[in-house]
C-alpha cells in the first residue's frame, strides 16, 4: 500500500488527515465520499495504516509489523466490513462485524478501525443500528464509511461524521501517473486520462484494458471516415455500434472528445490541448470543412443521444439520428 505522499491529488483531505494525526484529534467516524474509482478505499486504507503505524508519524513507515500486516490485509485491528449479498449490507452483518465487536479492545494497536466500503448499501435498519456506535464509540474506535452516494446515508449518520469529499483529479496529473507508473505512451495516456474524468482508478482500468484500446480504434475508424462512408458502410457501422450496448456510453464519450478536439482546433489552431493530437491531420481536415454551428449541433446531438439511450429509446434509431447530424456540413 502507498503512503500519503504517493497518492495523486486530494491534497486538502490528506492535509486534514495528517493534521488530525499530528494534533491527536482523530475523529471516531468519517465519511469518504466520491465517484467510483476516485480513491476512497486507498485514502481510507492509508489513513488506517498510518494511525496504526508503530513509528507514530504522519506517513506509514511501511516496515514495522503493523504496516506489514496492513499491507498484507491481515491486520487484526483494521476490519474491512464484508457483506454476502451484492446489493445490500444487512443489520446482521453490521451487528456481527462492528456492533458486537467494537467493545473488544484492540489486539495490538492504538485504534480499532472499521472500514465500510459501499456504505450506501447499508439498509435503513443497518444504518440505525450503527448510529448508536457512532454516537457513543469507545475511545479507540474509528469508523470509516466509503460511499459514492452520500444521499443514501441517513441524515443522522451524515451529521455525526466528518465528511471528506474527494474531488476529481486534474487530467494532467492522471496522465502523468499513467505514464510514470504504468508506462502508458503519451498519446494513449492522454486519451485514457480524458476518458477517466479525474478518476485514477478508472484511468488505471481503461489503460490496462485491451477492450478499451480496441474500442478506441474502432471509434476512430468511424470518426475519421464517417464523411466518406457509403450509405451501406454507415448502416453497418450503426448496426455494429447498436449491438454493443454495454459500451455505448464509452463510444459516445469518445465521439465527444473527437468533436471537441475539432472545435478547439478550429477556434485556436493549437494542437497541445487536443485529446487525439496524433490524429491532427484528420482533425485539421474536419475543422476546415465544418462550421462552428455544425460542430455545436453535433455536440448537442451527442448529449441528446445519451439522454435518449437512458430513456430506453431504440438504440439503432438514436444512432441513425446522431449520424445524420454528423453527416451534415
Residue locations for each model-derived region?
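Short, polar/charged, Gly/Pro-enriched helix-capping and turn/loop motifs at alpha-helix termini
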Residues: 57-58, 108-109, 144, 269, ...
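A short beta-strand-to-loop transition that corresponds to the Sensor-1 phosphate-sensing loop
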Residues: 118-119, 145-150
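Residues immediately C-terminal
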Residues: 121, 136, 152
